[in-house]
Amino acid sequence: MSYKYLVKRLEDSGYETYLVGGVLRDKLLGEKIHDIDLTTRARPEQIMKIFSDMKLIDIGKKFGTIKVIYKSEEFEITSFRAESLYKDKRHPDKISFSNTIEEDLKRRDFTINAMAERNGKIIDLFDGKKDLKNKIIRAVGNPYERIEEDYLRALRAVRFATVLDFEIEKNLKNAIKNKKNNIEEISKERIRDEIDKILLSKNPSRGIRLLENLDLLEYIFPEVKKMIGFNQHSSHHKFDLFEHSMKVLDMTPANLKTRMAGLFHDTGKIDTFFLDENGEGRFFGHQEISKEIIKNRLKELKYPKKFIENTLLLVERHMDNTNTYTKKSVRKLLRKVGDENIYDLFDLQKADVLSTVHDNTENILNAKKLLEEILNSNTPRKKDQIDFSGNDLIEIGFKEGKELGEILNEVYNLVMDEKLENKKSEIVKYIKNKYNNLDRNY
């Protein structure tokens, strides 16, 4: 493996070097290894000198970390460090480098991440292997101190418990609850990154439930917390609003925008709820309210603009399948949400249906078939694919203005619905026939 060459260069230069953290954890679990982190007695300047012939990225030199690019792979190499105070709840006030791996491991967050390996020998000062075997997330040393140093560790604990299907140790749970207000001191971007990993896990609802169990859901997704225990009074639903949303979340594919939409798609039901004359719960227009709710939350968490736009489309259109899909309605939907979102929308709708008393997804399956027919046909799906333009209208006597755009939209919709052939001569013929009573200089 490529990292062995980096280790050899450091060792040959006189600096003991270890595999550390997540790579060792995943290796012991038999999981696929993604990121390889090394820790060494070499200081940042020495690391940079040893690898001066390679591409280096200073991602945190003052904190002792250098990223080395070797054979197109990225490796983070960090100098041994000692424990320090964390007044900003994120970074140590002062970086104290250490000369021993033992001192370095003491500062790490959880026992399963506080193991190191050198020459095939594992150093495990805090029984990390035992906690891996017993599926426990346990803090290194005093959990209150670890959480106080950097409260993001609370979300990391939830993420590891969710992704690995582990339990959070009781004292660590208590520390997280005790320091819960500290979450407000974490940057939105760091919170977002942990939430993404939770939502993309095999069992995302477990992560949401853990956040609630640890009193964190009200800080991160207060709109989701409001759904807990909300009775829908609906013959279509066997679960309360929260449980329904958890089912939807778990049934969606591991796609971030689809899962985020699944989590929030019904948050607007609380504000639109009323009982009809038969005592049945109604939520007219709840998708529009849900859309506004998730828009505000995603902006708060600093998600990219394009991601927000696409996720909003899924929430806004998740009720479209309540009407029987036709080729015309699928075309219209395709125009609304775009190629990049329509399959994700169908995935969301399917998960939504399967989380009710109904399990009939025939309408959605039919919509997918119709969509395939549309995509495989020569029918244009975008305006620039129409064999006609505003210049053509001007050439046959129309003047620039509002009317020009209205006629072009009319032509576009007719061609899209296969009611008019996408051929300039046919389009011109249609326009002349329709507008022949107007005083045009054709």
Predicted segments with their positions:
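Catalytic cores of the polymerase beta-like nucleotidyltransferase superfamily
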Residues: 1-442
